[in-house]
């Protein structure tokens, strides 16, 4: 009986226009970002042949993200969610546009300055992500009923991770054959499709009324809420540090070049491996949501994620590296759903 009820809920979500539009928005924007990430990483490593440049690329993204995340959350509470979503997508279109003259070689005369342009572009991507993530979460809560959240979250995870599988592969193939220019164009086009999808979005639930608190009061209230909930704080901190110290994919261009002597196609496939694991785990969790012992699953997922990253670090072959990255995706999907 419960299986039939679960199937009915799943079918209702899949035929909901608003839910489909939201998933299209998420898929297209994720494809845009993944193609950009693969392309920018390969681009800057080709220019510098220095693993440090990849670390700086990640830093260029994370600093704007963390600096604007709290303000972005307040903006999402106060402003139109659709407009903020369009703003985030528009930044991705702007990034792709800015990177075209760099990829075409028009700015080669700047020499070392070219990489700083790439860092600046990725910084804009970090700023966009700060607004995109909370906006999606609020739109998700408005499109679905509370009782549908568990399965809706699992479906959203499958869509997200599916785009994370396709995006890097497409990016790697575009870099290998047509070249960097085509990859940046593809990233911009997917961002445009995301703008169209979210512009068409119609809520099926009455929108949440904006808070009357000031920006700083809202930020302080949010921080107090998180720090007052020890279980929430511990879970968030555990997941954050696991991801912070386990971001193996950031170094993949150097790993491909120095250890595997591979090509952009190999980069795309390895970057897609965690997402493949997440898709399979998410598909399972969509039909079998975790209802009890969430803390145990979270601890096990974080521990498994750490061991998989260590295994990847010791890998000397493409197959072994892909296998360990696959399991990082499996454990990451569990932690996200929990």
What are these language model-derived features?
Residues 112-116, 175-191, 263-269:
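A membrane-interface helix-boundary motif in multi-pass transporters
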Residues 20-38, 60-76, 80-95, 117-176, ...:
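Substrate-agnostic recognition of the 12-TM MFS/MFS-like secondary transporter fold
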Residues 45, 98-102, 106, 125, ...:
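MFS-fold secondary transporters
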Residues 41-47, 100-109, 166-186, 258-260:
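Transmembrane alpha-helix termini and helix-breaking/packing motifs in multi-pass membrane transporters
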Residues 106, 138, 142, 180, ...:
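Helix-loop junctions on the cytosolic side of multi-pass membrane transporters
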Residues 6-64, 224-274:
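Helix-loop boundary and gating motifs at the non-cytosolic
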Residues 101-121, 313-324:
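Helix-loop junctions at membrane interfaces in 12-TM secondary transporters
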Residues 67-71, 78, 84, 88, ...:
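C-terminal transmembrane bundle of multi-pass solute transporters/carriers
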